[in-house]
């Protein structure tokens, strides 16, 4: 068994058993961003679940893009419930976009305007954050990236028709956990969400054949990064994320 497969199996086994890893076994840890993405794709293929969404955020340094697929079993309509057995219970307040057109992987480059013309709806989203490792934040960013950038679930609110992206960039996010309002950003913290989605669409051409052949599809939801950093819920927490003009999304830990 090769290193990529060993690493993918370790992440899957840790999730199934609800245990944490101190490190990747048998020297299988990713040594590059390319290997981290190969591990993501191997986990995806081994689990056999359909992609329903993607998360994408700005890169830094050698990590030119941070992104991960989110499978159909991890996407929930608000109001949603997650298990109290989740250890970290990290919470991010986000805005997500649903594509109305396929964006197949191709040699040409997708532009920001291509993305603008491909988006159907926009929605408030809550990302539930978990790690399969024993520390937070994960010390090695490549490990976090291989672990689907620490995604556990994506909860989406009511969708509204896509409108002026400049107005969306200037919205103010609010996150409330157990009636306590967290600090969130006014204005999109990750630059330009449409440019991020264009980077994601172009990134498909360098993924494994399993992902490359799929590309991005009409109906895919793309969430574009946190407006609050990461805050943390506790047992039986009730979480609400709000954006003016978009509405809200709700998550509860109680099952």
Question: Where are these predicted regions, by residue range?
Answer:
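Catalytic-pocket segment enriched in acidic/His residues
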Residues: 149, 154-255
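A generic local secondary-structure boundary/capping motif
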Residues: 83-88, 141-145, 160-165, 230
């Amino acid at each position: 068994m090769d290193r990529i497969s060993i690493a993918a199996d370790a992440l899957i086994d840790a999730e199934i058993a609800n245990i944490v890893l101190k490190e990747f076994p048998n020297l299988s840890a990713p040594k590059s961003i390319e290997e981290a993405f190969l591990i993501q794709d191997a986990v995806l293929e081994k689990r056999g679940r359909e992609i329903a969404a993607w998360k994408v955020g700005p890169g830094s340094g050698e990590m030119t893009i941070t992104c991960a697929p989110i499978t159909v079993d991890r996407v929930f309509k608000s109001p949603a419930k997650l298990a109290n057995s989740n250890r970290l219970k990290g919470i991010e307040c986000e805005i997500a976009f649903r594509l109305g057109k396929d964006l197949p992987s191709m040699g040409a480059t997708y532009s920001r305007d291509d993305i603008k013309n491909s988006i159907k709806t926009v929605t408030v989203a809550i990302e539930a954050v978990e790690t399969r490792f024993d520390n937070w934040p994960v010390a090695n960013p490549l490990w976090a990236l291989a672990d689907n950038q620490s995604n556990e679930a994506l909860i989406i609110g009511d969708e509204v028709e896509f409108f002026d992206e400049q107005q969306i960039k200037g919205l103010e996010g609010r996150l409330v956990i157990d009636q306590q309002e967290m600090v969130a950003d006014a204005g999109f913290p990750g630059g330009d969400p449409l440019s991020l989605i264009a980077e994601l669409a172009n990134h498909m051409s360098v993924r494994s054949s399993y992902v490359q052949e799929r590309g991005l599809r009409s109906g895919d939801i793309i969430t574009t990064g946190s407006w609050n950093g990461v805050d943390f819920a506790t047992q039986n927490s009730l979480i609400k994320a709000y954006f003016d003009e978009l509405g809200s999304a709700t998550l509860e830990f109680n099952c």
